């Protein structure tokens, strides 16, 4: 009788399966890592070193897989690693994404609409080809588990092999690795899915510390005093436009060849600041930092919610605080203030300007509607209004503006940015800046309608910049340690009808640290914590 043997009837040792998965991940999830490594160490002169890197990555991958994989969770763990490798490598290879804790926090706060913008055919092809199909093979594989004693020996042997693969290359090329880790340290952040796994563990530790942290607010401005009251002068009405994803080198006032802010160019008395650096490279990190007393050197995004911020101080002193948000949310900035002072403008519930485009995306200008009612309800009071933009949020820049701002053509109308002709990507991004220009100009126009009764002022600062394909990097979110300047150099503008608010010199080197003292000065508030800190006004 003829026997028939199907491939799925053959069994496989669990440690062989782990090795195959580790090899697959090392080979398919790290294309960007090897590309970055070879850019620093050309293959023509460093073939041995590059090969040693590949072996070391395989060793590290095997070590991680073996550490996480045990009999009763073997297949779920391997499948999870395969899916994670496919997803993380797609965004790394496509957008240059690096998975540090800040990026993970930003990803967790990404809403459904933003996630949809990142989904495309290439994404699903990658996930199916490098994630789902290998996972199916793992799921149907028949695993021949050894006895407990043999399994322990085989696990130890596999650990030994992984350590040999990891350490021997480092030993053979020790001088080059010493230089690599010292001078080119950022390149290692591109290793997937090891970096995401490490960052998940680190983030879990951070979240645990937050969960066990004291809930009492840590005050930084108990000594804050308002030196003049609205009863002694004209009350102040200030709009702070919290920008999104605008970069300084695409602003005409900073030498850019295009008129991306033509309406602001016509505003008398507008001050531009050309040398401003953001606190971070993501909304989740930068926005709380923009209102912090700590300054970016001492700022900790994980404990920011427990810290008094400048809005808490101004609210305590009687300044009316209002936050309207067409982005994600206030990132914790408004958490300690009454919910009645925060309004979501990302849906038609509050935003009346959502049907001007094919995407039914609510526009930033909708946040201006109805502000007169707020002013009337707080007549004679100092007021600070935050307008948090959608701005230039990527990758779907073409969705961020209406047809009247489509000045630069053709435009990239997709979210696979690397596949777009580079100039079309720039065109879409610059058109979105034209919409921001219009929004800021309209904010100033609205303030001017209240000049008779208020000293009015407008401050605009973007939360971070954006990479548009420079060196193969797109979007934002890179760790500060090696973020390109495009992700941290941001535009900032100031305008007021009050001539006593003298803007700082345009080329003054400033950071997001200048925002808190500026907001205090606009309401004649002094606080020792920031009394010597540079501001946008003198």
From Swiss-Prot:
Sites binding Zn(2+) sit at 244, 283, 463-464
Q: What is the effect of changing residue 283 to A?
A: Abolishes transfer of phosphoethanolamine (PEA) to a lipid A analog in vitro. Reduces resistance of E.coli to colistin about 16-fold, by comparison with the same strain expressing wild-type mcr-2
Task: Report the GO terms under cellular component.
Answer: plasma membrane
Q: Where is the protein found, in the record's own terms? A: Cell inner membrane
Which keywords annotate this record? Antibiotic resistance, Cell inner membrane, Cell membrane, Disulfide bond, Membrane, Metal-binding, Phosphoprotein, Plasmid, Transferase, Transmembrane, Transmembrane helix, Zinc
Which of the residues bear the PTM Phosphothreonine? 283
Q: How does it sit in the membrane?
A: Multi-pass membrane protein
Task: Determine if Ion transport is one of this entry's keywords.
Answer: no
What does changing residue 91 to A do? No affect on transfer of phosphoethanolamine (PEA) to a lipid A analog in vitro. Reduces resistance of E.coli to colistin about 2-fold, by comparison with the same strain expressing wild-type mcr-2
Main EC class the enzyme belongs to: transferase
Q: What is its EC number?
A: 2.7.8.43
Q: Which PROSITE patterns match?
A: ADH_SHORT (PS00061)
Disulfide bond entries = 279-289, 354-362, 412-420
Single Gene Ontology MF annotation? phosphotransferase activity, phosphate group as acceptor
**Primary place of residence?**
membrane
Instruction: Please describe what this protein does.
Output: Probably catalyzes the addition of a phosphoethanolamine moiety to lipid A. Phosphoethanolamine modification of lipid A confers polymyxin resistance. Confers resistance to polymyxin-type antibiotics such as colistin.
Q: Which family does it belong to?
A: Belongs to the phosphoethanolamine transferase family.
Protein's name in the database = Phosphatidylethanolamine transferase Mcr-2
User: What does UniProt list as this organism's lineage?
Assistant: Bacteria, Pseudomonadati, Pseudomonadota, Gammaproteobacteria, Enterobacterales
State which gene encodes it.
mcr2
């Amino acid at each position: 009788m003829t026997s028939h043997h199907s491939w799925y009837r053959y069994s496989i040792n669990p440690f062989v399966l782990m090795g195959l998965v580790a090899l697959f991940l090392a080979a398919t999830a790290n294309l960007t890592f090897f590309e970055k490594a070879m850019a620093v160490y050309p293959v023509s002169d460093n073939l041995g070193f590059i090969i040693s890197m590949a072996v070391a990555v395989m060793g590290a991958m095997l070590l991680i897989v073996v550490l996480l994989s045990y009999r009763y969770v073997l297949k779920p763990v391997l499948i999870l690693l395969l899916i994670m490798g496919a997803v993380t490598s797609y965004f790394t290879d496509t957008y240059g994404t690096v998975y540090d804790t800040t990026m993970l926090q930003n990803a967790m706060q990404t809403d459904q609409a933003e996630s949809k913008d990142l989904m495309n055919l290439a994404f699903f092809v990658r996930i199916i080809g490098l994630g789902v199909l290998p996972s199916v093979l793992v799921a149907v594989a028949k695993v021949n588990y050894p006895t407990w004693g043999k399994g322990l020996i085989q696990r130890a042997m596999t650990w030994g092999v992984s350590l040999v693969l990891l350490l021997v290359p480092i030993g053979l090329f020790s001088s080059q690795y010493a230089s690599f880790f010292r001078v080119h340290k950022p390149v290692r952040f591109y290793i997937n899915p090891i970096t995401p796994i490490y960052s998940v563990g680190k983030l879990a530790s951070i979240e645990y510390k937050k969960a066990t942290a004291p809930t009492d607010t840590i005050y930084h401005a108990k000594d804050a005093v308002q030196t003049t009251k609205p009863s002694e002068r004209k009350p102040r009405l200030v709009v702070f436009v919290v920008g999104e994803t605008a970069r300084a080198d695409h602003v005409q006032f900073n030498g850019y060849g295009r008129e991306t802010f033509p309406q602001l160019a016509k505003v008398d008395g507008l001050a531009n600041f050309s040398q401003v650096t953001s606190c971070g490279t993501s909304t989740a990190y930068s926005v709380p930092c923009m209102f912090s007393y700590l300054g970016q050197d001492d700022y900790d995004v994980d404990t920011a919610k427990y810290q008094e911020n400048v809005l808490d101080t101004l609210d305590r002193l009687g300044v009316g605080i209002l936050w309207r948000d067409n982005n994600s949310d206030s990132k914790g900035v408004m958490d300690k203030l009454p919910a009645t002072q925060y309004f979501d403008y990302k849906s038609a519930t509050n935003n009346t300007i959502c049907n001007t485009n094919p995407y039914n995306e609510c526009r930033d200008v909708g946040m201006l509607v109805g502000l007169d009612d707020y002013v009337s309800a707080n007549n004679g009071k100092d007021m600070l209004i935050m307008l948090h933009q959608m701005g230039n949020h990527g990758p779907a820049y073409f969705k961020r503006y209406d047809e009247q701002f489509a000045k630069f053509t053709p435009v990239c109308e997709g979210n696979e940015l690397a596949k777009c002709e580079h100039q079309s990507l720039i065109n879409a991004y610059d058109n979105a800046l034209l919409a921001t220009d219009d929004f800021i100009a309209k904010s100033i126009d609205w303030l001017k309608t209240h000049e008779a009764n208020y000293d009015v002022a407008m401050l605009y600062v973007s939360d971070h910049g954006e990479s548009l394909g420079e060196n193969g990097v797109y979007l934002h979110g890179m760790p500060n340690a090696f973020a390109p300047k495009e992700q941290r150099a941001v535009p900032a503008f100031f305008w007021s009808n009050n001539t006593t608010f003298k803007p700082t010199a345009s080329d003054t080197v400033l950071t997001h640290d200048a925002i808190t003292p500026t907001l205090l000065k606009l309401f004649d508030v002094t606080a020792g914590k920031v009394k010597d800190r540079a501001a946008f006004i003198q």
